[in-house]
């Protein structure tokens, strides 16, 4: 039986601005997304029977049709029934390293890896654009997870404009295992508190989305100026999440106070918080200091870095 092993990186938001509502119930967003080298491993094996099996080493991750990984495989079966009949089903194993329900696109990047893996397994020859379009039907972050690197994302997050990739900005990432923030709750509360500021006119929305391309954070990214990037981190959802989750606020403040940290922010709807550092040694020192200050085993702390790619194939059999 043929098989592929893939690496599925997590993402952080360097910028997240909510600019309006969409007719489909989502929000109009302006984001800058960044791949990091904290990643899950996905193994995909072909099966002789026309079935889908999903396995995962993390007890919180379901392996039924509620899992985005399963739905990604199901999507490929639906779109390419002849290939499914010819090549058979798939057995998918997810080795989780990315924290679950953390605002790091763990589920989305796993789904992206399944799309890439099945494309290879069934010899479909899909382009990256075609894979991104398939991914957009599964979730807003999936197209980015296929592409990876450093990207401006607009619409609900599926319209991507690549930026020069950032490599080797070091990151300390913290997340309480037992703490989850509902993405739907965060956006709903933001709408309730700040919906009056939303842009309504289609041209205004398009202009605001386009404006980020000439903004100061994009200039800093193009110039690979880590300090300038760190000074321009922005996430609208912090306005509703931080007041409601004091643990997240405290962790953010603690990270921000550490020597060597050049910027701190919550990723996505949280509860993950990250700090940017210019060197690995600084990041490791910050991790050690925060661990001493908060010895709670419920707090996961990672040292990671920015990377230039999305899904990677690392083995086949």
UniProtKB/Swiss-Prot annotation:
The UniProt annotation places ATP binding at 99-109
- Show the InterPro entries listed in the entry: GHMP_kinase_C_dom (IPR013750), GHMP_kinase_C_sf (IPR036554), GHMP_kinase_N_dom (IPR006204), IspE (IPR004424), Ribosomal_Su5_D2-typ_SF (IPR020568), Ribsml_uS5_D2-typ_fold_subgr (IPR014721)
Transmembrane spans: none
Molecular-function GO terms, alphabetical: 4-(cytidine 5'-diphospho)-2-C-methyl-D-erythritol kinase activity; ATP binding
Q: What Gene3D superfamilies is this protein classified in? A: 3.30.230.10, GHMP kinase, C-terminal domain (3.30.70.890)
For this protein, what is the EC number? 2.7.1.148
The GO annotation for biological process reads: isopentenyl diphosphate biosynthetic process, methylerythritol 4-phosphate pathway; terpenoid biosynthetic process
Catalytic activity field? 4-CDP-2-C-methyl-D-erythritol + ATP = 4-CDP-2-C-methyl-D-erythritol 2-phosphate + ADP + H(+)
Q: Sorted alphabetically, which keywords does the UniProt record give?
A: ATP-binding, Isoprene biosynthesis, Kinase, Nucleotide-binding, Transferase
Q: Kindly identify the residues recorded as the active site.
A: 11, 141
**Pathway the protein acts in:** Isoprenoid biosynthesis; isopentenyl diphosphate biosynthesis via DXP pathway; isopentenyl diphosphate from 1-deoxy-D-xylulose 5-phosphate: step 3/6
Q: Name one Pfam family in it.
A: GHMP_kinases_C
Which family is annotated? Belongs to the GHMP kinase family. IspE subfamily.
Cited function: Catalyzes the phosphorylation of the position 2 hydroxy group of 4-diphosphocytidyl-2C-methyl-D-erythritol.
Q: What is this protein called?
A: 4-diphosphocytidyl-2-C-methyl-D-erythritol kinase
| Designated gene of the protein | ispE
């Amino acid at each position: 039986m043929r098989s592929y092993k893939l690496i599925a990186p997590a993402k952080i938001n360097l910028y997240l601005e909510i600019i309006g509502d969409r007719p489909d119930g989502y929000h109009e967003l302006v984001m800058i997304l960044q791949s990091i080298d904290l990643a899950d491993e996905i193994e995909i094996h072909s099966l002789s029977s026309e079935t889908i099996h999903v396995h995962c080493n993390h007890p919180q991750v379901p392996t039924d049709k509620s899992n985005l990984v399963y739905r990604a495989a199901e999507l490929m079966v639906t779109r390419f029934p002849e290939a499914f009949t010819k090549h058979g089903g798939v057995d998918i194993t997810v080795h989780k390293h990315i924290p679950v329900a953390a605002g790091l696109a763990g589920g989305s990047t796993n789904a992206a890896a399944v799309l890439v893996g099945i494309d290879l397994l069934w010899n479909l020859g899909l382009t990256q654009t075609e894979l991104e379009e398939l991914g957009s039907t599964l979730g807003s972050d999936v197209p980015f997870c296929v592409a990876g690197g450093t990207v401006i994302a607009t619409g609900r997050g599926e319209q991507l404009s690549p930026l020069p990739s950032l490599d080797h900005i070091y990151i300390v990432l913290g997340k309480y295992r037992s703490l989850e923030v509902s993405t739907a709750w965060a956006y709903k509360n933001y709408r309730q508190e700040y919906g009056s500021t939303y842009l309504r006119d289609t041209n205004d929305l398009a202009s605001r989305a386009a404006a980020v391309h000439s903004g100061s954070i994009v200039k800093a990214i193009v110039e690979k100026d880590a300090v300038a990037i760190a000074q321009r981190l922005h996430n609208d959802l912090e306005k509703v999440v931080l007041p409601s989750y004091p643990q997240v606020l405290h962790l953010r403040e603690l990270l921000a106070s550490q020597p060597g940290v050049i910027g701190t922010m919550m990723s996505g709807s949280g509860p993950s918080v990250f700090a940017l550092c210019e060197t690995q040694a600084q990041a490791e020192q910050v991790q050690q200091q925060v661990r001493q200050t908060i010895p709670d085993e419920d707090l996961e702390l990672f040292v990671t870095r920015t990377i230039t790619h999305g899904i990677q194939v690392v083995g086949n059999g």
